[in-house]
A protein has these predicted regions:
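Conserved N-terminal segment of class I S-adenosyl-L-methionine
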Residues: 1-90, 109, 141-147, 163-173
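S-adenosyl-L-methionine-dependent methyltransferase catalytic module, highlighting the catalytic core
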Residues: 82-84, 91, 95-96, 103-174
Length: 174
């Protein structure tokens, strides 16, 4: 299903995940308002978080799913052992927040197809405006808006763009 490059990138991502406090999942909180609106608009009751990181946003006292109005959720992140297995079933909402630039270009279609195969209503994909690639994170697919818009053009996909220069204050949720 995936290319050799995907598995090589996944191995780098797994090492990064093990050695870093990043990818804990707390970045999800910055999308609470947008996702809450989407959940209401599409009457979503359950959700798959594809690329959830360590998933700490779901163990926090301010549970991310509760904040956006989701009753049931499942977690998947191939780079983190505890969430590496893909949950069975389909979900009203599939979210993929700041994940796709870590997937090789040759595997984007396969990953998106996998997410859409688990999606009943809406798949929300968040992409960050990346202006430079000086990072320890294993970015492999840095593309412009037009490329992503064309690549992710599907009736179930809703794109959210975020600017990398906007600071985010987690404290209002913790």
């Amino acid at each position: 299903m995936f290319t050799k490059q995907y598995y090589e990138t996944l191995e780098r991502s797994q090492k990064f995940q093990q050695q870093s406090v990043n990818w804990a999942g707390y970045g999800s909180y910055q999308y609470v308002d947008q996702l809450r609106s989407i959940v209401k608009e599409h009457c979503c009751q359950n959700m798959l978080d594809y690329g959830c990181g360590k998933g700490l946003q779901y163990t926090d006292k301010n549970n991310f799913a509760d904040l956006i109005g989701i009753e049931q959720y499942a977690l998947h992140d191939p780079a983190y052992d505890q969430h590496a297995s893909m949950p069975k079933g389909t979900w009203d909402l599939v979210i993929c927040l700041d994940v796709l630039p870590f997937v090789p270009e040759s595997d984007i279609d396969a990953v998106v197809d996998l997410m859409l195969s688990r999606c009943n209503k809406i798949c929300v994909i968040v992409l960050q405006e990346i202006t430079h690639v000086k990072t320890k994170k294993p970015l492999v697919c840095v593309k412009d808006h037009a490329w992503w818009q064309q690549k992710l053009s599907h009736e179930k996909v809703q794109l959210i763009w975020r600017q990398s220069t906007v600071p985010f204050d987690y404290s209002k949720f913790l």
